[in-house]
């Protein structure tokens, strides 16, 4: 009955789409997916180019994250590198040009381990596609950026951040000194990005583990310290932060009390941001 009412009353649909808690989900994913015709084509068993295409160019990964579903022994030989780039380029060539956000670069293996990552970024740009990349930033050193300046041409760069101190990050990634290395790389990146006047949208993704809902406030403090250490005229170098729960098969879900606490912490962060603190 409820679904029938919603289908037949546009005002209810407007409330859900424009004012509901899932507004971004509807407007950024569901509605564009429907408008693309992909769902109708699937039902009718007609071919259509995928609505979103993930490019996973990593050859290996230095992390063994506790919530990652990948095979920790997985890696690709360097001999397959050129063939892989050729396949990616063919895929980009075949893609319809009506959606500039069709592609993104990510992976169960770390994208920066591909020494030709710059070629992929440039090829997307050449074909008028936006390029966004997700990385753990362990390799995002000054030297790496010098060798791969194409990183600054990305439309969006999102770093997966795995802990608010060295102990927690090591527990998650199984990589010693990962917290120190990644934090240092982020600080250097924002400085270089500012100097090069790069327009890349930059931010972090953080996984909220069970019983770690207070980490959000500590995470914000870390970002504030990075901003202070960078000492740029631009006070805030971060354009966004995304949060998610541990959705791995054996991940421990947050209970209602922990969700309420996390919600309160998010509101606290909003207040700090509004006060420019």
For the regions a protein language model found, what residue spans apply to each?
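Radical SAM enzyme [4Fe-4S]-AdoMet core and its adjacent flexible, acidic
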Residues: 1-14, 56, 77-78, 83-86, ...
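N-terminal [4Fe-4S]-dependent radical SAM core
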Residues: 2-54
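Canonical Radical SAM [4Fe-4S] cluster-binding loop centered on the CxxxCxxC motif
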Residues: 45-87
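A general structural motif
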Residues: 48-52, 98-102, 126-130, 151-156, ...
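Glycine-centered loop/turn positions within well-structured domains
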Residues: 63, 131, 164-167
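Residues lining the SAM
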Residues: 71, 106, 205
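Conserved Radical SAM active-site core
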Residues: 75-134, 138-151
């Amino acid at each position: 009955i409820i679904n029938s009412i919603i289908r037949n009353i546009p005002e209810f649909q407007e409330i859900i789409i424009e004012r509901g808690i899932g507004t971004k989900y509807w407007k950024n994913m569901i509605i564009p997916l429907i408008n693309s015709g992909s769902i109708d084509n699937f039902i009718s068993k007609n071919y259509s180019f995928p609505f979103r295409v993930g490019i996973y160019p990593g050859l290996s990964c230095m992390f063994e994250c506790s919530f990652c579903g990948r095979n920790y022994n997985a890696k690709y030989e360097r001999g397959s590198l050129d063939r892989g780039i050729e396949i990616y380029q063919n895929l980009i060539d075949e893609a319809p040009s009506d959606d500039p956000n069709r592609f993104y670069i990510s992976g169960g293996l770390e994208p920066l381990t591909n020494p030709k990552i710059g070629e992929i970024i440039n090829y997307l740009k050449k074909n008028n596609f936006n390029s966004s990349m997700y990385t753990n930033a362990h390799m995002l050193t000054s030297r790496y950026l010098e060798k791969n300046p194409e990183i600054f041409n990305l439309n969006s760069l999102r770093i997966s951040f795995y802990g608010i101190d060295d102990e927690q990050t090591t527990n998650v990634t199984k990589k010693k000194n990962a917290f120190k290395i990644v934090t240092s790389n982020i600080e250097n990146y924002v400085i270089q990005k500012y100097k090069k006047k790069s327009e890349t949208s930059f931010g972090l993704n953080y996984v909220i583990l069970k019983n770690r809902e207070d980490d959000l406030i500590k995470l914000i403090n870390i970002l504030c310290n990075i901003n202070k250490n960078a000492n740029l005229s631009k006070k805030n170098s971060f354009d966004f932060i995304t949060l998610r729960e541990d959705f791995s098969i054996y991940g421990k879900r947050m209970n209602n009390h922990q969700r309420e606490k996390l919600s309160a912490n998010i509101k606290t962060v909003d207040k700090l941001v509004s006060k420019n603190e």
